[in-house]
Structures are given as C-alpha cells and as structure tokens.
Curated annotation (Swiss-Prot):
GO terms for cellular component: host cell endoplasmic reticulum membrane; membrane; viral envelope; virion membrane. Gene3D superfamilies: 1.20.1280.260, 2.60.40.350, Tick-borne Encephalitis virus Glycoprotein, domain 1, Viral Envelope Glycoprotein, domain 2, Viral Envelope Glycoprotein, domain 3. This is Genome polyprotein. Residues 1-447 are extracellular.
Amino acid sequence: SRCTHLENRDFVTGTQGTTRVTLVLELGGCVTITAEGKPSMDVWLDAIYQESPAKTREYCLHAKLSETKVAARCPTMGPAVLTEERQIGTVCKRDQSDRGWGNHCGLFGKGSIVACVKAACEAKKKATGYVYDANKIVYTVKVEPHTGDYVAANETHKGRKTATFTVSSEKTILTLGEYGDVSLLCRVASGVDLAQTIILELDKTAEHLPTAWQVHRDWFNDLALPWKHDGNPHWNNAERLVEFGAPHAVKMDVYNLGDQTGVLLKALAGVPVAHIEGNKYHLKSGHVTCEVGLEKLKMKGLTYTMCDKSKFAWKRTPTDSGHDTVVMEVTFSGSKPCRIPVRAVAHGSPDVNVAMLITPNPTIENDGGGFIEMQLPPGDNIIYVGELSHQWFQTGSSIGRVFQTTRKGIERLTVIGEHAWDFGSAGGFFSSIGKAVHTVLGGAFNSIFGGVGFLPKLLMGVALAWLGLNTRNPTMSMSFLMAGGLVLAMTLGVGA
C-alpha cells in the first residue's frame, strides 16, 4: 500500500453501513480508508500545479555592454551631443570635465561631456517571474485499493487511479476494476496567497543549484535590477548594472557591475524552493477536502474457499509499519485463489480475535496476493496466518491511541471548517452534527470498539440510554444519555 511507505499517514474508519466519508488531504500525507464490508483504499494528494503560468517580469542579472561613445565640448561651446541619447536601449550620463590648452580648448574651465553605452543582457542570465491563476491550478488526487500485493516505495501499483480537480470541477467517478467504483467530490484550497505569490525562476546554469523560488510579489517588484516585460526587447533601468567613471577631459570610462546571480542567491537564502517539472509549476502547500462515495465499492474474493492452513510460509515476517500497524507477507503452495485465514489473540484471551484488518479479506491470487496489514491492541499478542504463528508486542496504550485519534479528528474538522456545516434546513443541520461527531470521534470509537460486533454495540448504546432515562441523579442521567447517544450514533451512522 502507498500509505505504508509515508511518514504522514492518517486512518479514517467508516462505521457499519458507511457510504460516504470526508477526507482532508494535504501534500506529503496519505489517508487509508477502512469500512466494514468494503475494500480498504489509500487516498492522497499527489500534486498541486499550474501548466505554463503567465510571465510577469524578467530581470537581468548580468549586463552586456557594447558600442561605448563619448562626446565633449569646450567651455562656453554649449552641451555635448550624442544621437544615442535619444535611442531606447542605451544608458547615458552627462557631466562636466576640466578643459584647457592641454586638451584642445582655447579657454580654461568646465566643458560638457556625455557618454553612452548600449545595454543588453548576457545569455542565460535572466530571472523570470511567473504568476499563478487560481482558476487554472490543478489538484491531482490518487486512489489505490488494498489488493494484497506488496508494492515497494519506488514502484507503481497497477490498480492506482488518478483524478484531477480545479476550482470548477465536479464529482469524479473512478473505476477500480474488480473492486467497483468510487466517487470523489473535492473542494480545493491552496496553502498560499496566490495574489501575492511569484515564482522566481533563474536560467539554469549549474546542476547543483536550485532554479526557482516562491517569493512575495512586493519583494519581487522591489528588486534593484534592470527589468522588462515579456516580449519587450529593451530593458528598463539598465543603468542599475552600469557605472560611469569620473570624467577626464574628453574621456569617461564605463564599467559593467558584473554578474549579480550570487547576490540574488544570497538574498533568497531560506526562501521556499519551487519545483518545476517541464511546463508544470508546482505549489508546495495546499489541501483538498474530499467527500468519498463508497456505495459502489465491493469486496473481492468473498466467494473463494479458505486456503489450506498448512501450506503457508513467511515471505516477510510481521514488522512494525511505523503507523501503529503491523505488516507481513506470506507465500502459499496450495490451490489458488483462496482466502487467507488470519487472526490474532491477546495474552490470556486465546479465543478472542483482536486483529483489526487494514487489508480486508486478504487473499492469495493466481498472480499475487499475500500481503496483510492489521492493527493490534497494545500489549502481548500472537499473530496466526494459517498454521504460522508469530509473537508480537504492540507498543503504546489504548488511552494514548484514543487521544491521538481524537486529536487527528479535531484537526480534520478544523481544516474542513465552514464546509462541514449545512444550515439550510433542520435535516441538513442535524446531518452536519452527525458528520462532525464521526469526524472527531470516529477513530477513537474504532480503537475502543474495533473488535465488537454490530449487535453488541447496538445493545450497549440502548442499555446506556435506558440507564440515563431511569437514573434520578441529573448528572448521572445526562452522562448515561450522552454516552448511549454517542454509541448509537457511531454504530448506526452512515456518514463519516
């Protein structure tokens, strides 16, 4: 599974009969969806980019000077004149120089002098700014079902599907082959102020240097360098890279201030680096809030027979995934396809299966399968795959796991923000409350009641509510009613 290889992983667990779940996807993260009776899926935000954004300004980092000319006049002879002064693309400076008999003037005094030089820009020495258009930014979301095949981090799963969204996109339906269809309706949000963001790109001259940065518009517009708009052949403020020496009679030296790339790179230290891939300019931050429809998903392999328990062997022994789950892979030498008998028991309870399978209904196929991921309660456990067994100690605590999943649920609801609430009708408002409860408490509820069946949870909720109605102490009554209501809501709810 894709999420297994990423550090930033979240789990969203649907309750009995779940048909829709709401996800918050961010760059660099991955969400695993599990729901009873449905295949598990990994969903992640793969990229945020715009193709060929519009250019705003080009800056020159190294001037190319040519055709220097100087004109001088003796005192009282009027101002010196060069026709280049009126030409676009030249830099000129007027001054006064000391004149006399030694330099061909009949009078001693200050005479007029003017120097001009043609200014262009050296090749591969430009810094170009690009601006994003919020309506053209593409958000790429990828979906991958848990098929039971092990896929390395640098490999691509054959069942991986891609959906793209913009601010005007509508619902997208992805076909996952034998696992049915999944629908995605995503609201997009960039993590930066696009109106104040410029991508500054340098002409690439060295492989080891970054070539683009994400900078503020005001900082970009204030750069003290020659600039022009795209398509204009002449540079504005070209004098910023030209220095004129002190005048001497009929001579005035012109100096090129040199390459300013190093100065610009020093100013960009600590600025977020932008990623450019071909004509795609990527954003480094942003998120999408997606409503995922699970109603047309279907489990694969439910009609398979159980595998022969004696013909399994470990290919990868159980290993900590780093996400509070255990991953393993087995090989099978018997008749295929078949369903893998897998369970786990806690110390002192040999008859109770405590494994919560992230890979639902694991199977061995004719061309693969055998990868299993599960979540176990903290403490000593024994994992059984057929007749294979492996002792496993799960670190952590149940209370800590509950707090962690609740914290993630609150973060998820905070990111969804106003879109989580529907005040248009009473039904919509109460539905929003139910969805918010699922978002915040769904993970904690699953951690506590993960191994409890539907009917026991239903009876527990009814019993708590009955105790609340029949308890005379107001505080106890409200506590029982709230607990019972939450258990019933999480058990009977169809949206998360």
